[in-house]
């Protein structure tokens, strides 16, 4: 998506990375290879490893279906923090319902209260570095800052294998196993 937006459409981009400390070295190298080759600045928020491990463990202990919610919330919040900090009005979101699927409405919770309630019940370490998505902040970013999400993969033809081949050829991208 970075390649397409920068090379084909000529957009000025700011890459955003929520580092939950679970990245492989190869995945991190891929991020830097792409941003360096495309001359794109990178904004990274690194959460404390022990804190994030405790948060994920609390989701596992709770038995909820959506154990990836903390990572999703962390990324969404980090994107908004970066957009606000640098005055960016449009976030290009790489979510694709084709490759990531969708969930029934009753399974989807995307707010700080949910994260906090699961963590309060099952976690042990206070959350200090995790960028939680509080409703008032979400409303501020949407209504006052007027930050909008654009999801090109909802409209573009996307083939994961073709994308991997292009990334490997053009940027030295390596398969990281994820």
Residues covered by each model-derived region:
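Nucleotide-activated chemistry modules centered on ATP-dependent adenylation/adenylyltransferase
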Residues: 4-178
């Amino acid at each position: 998506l970075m390649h397409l937006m920068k090379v084909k459409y000529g957009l000025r981009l700011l890459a955003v990375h929520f580092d939950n400390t679970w990245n492989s070295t190869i995945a991190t190298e891929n991020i830097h290879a792409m941003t360096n080759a495309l001359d794109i600045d990178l904004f990274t928020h690194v959460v404390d490893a022990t804190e994030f491990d405790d948060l994920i463990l609390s989701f596992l202990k709770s038995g909820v279906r959506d154990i990836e919610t903390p990572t999703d919330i962390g990324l969404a919040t980090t994107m908004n923090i970066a957009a606000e900090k640098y005055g960016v009005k449009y976030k290009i979101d790489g979510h694709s319902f084709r490759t990531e699927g969708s969930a029934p409405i009753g399974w989807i919770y995307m707010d700080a209260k949910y994260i906090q309630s699961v963590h309060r019940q099952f976690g042990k370490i206070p959350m200090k570095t995790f960028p939680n998505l509080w409703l008032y902040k979400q409303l501020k970013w949407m209504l006052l800052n007027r930050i909008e999400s654009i999801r090109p993969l909802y409209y573009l033809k996307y083939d994961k294998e073709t994308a991997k081949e292009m990334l490997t050829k053009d940027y030295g991208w390596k398969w990281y196993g994820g």
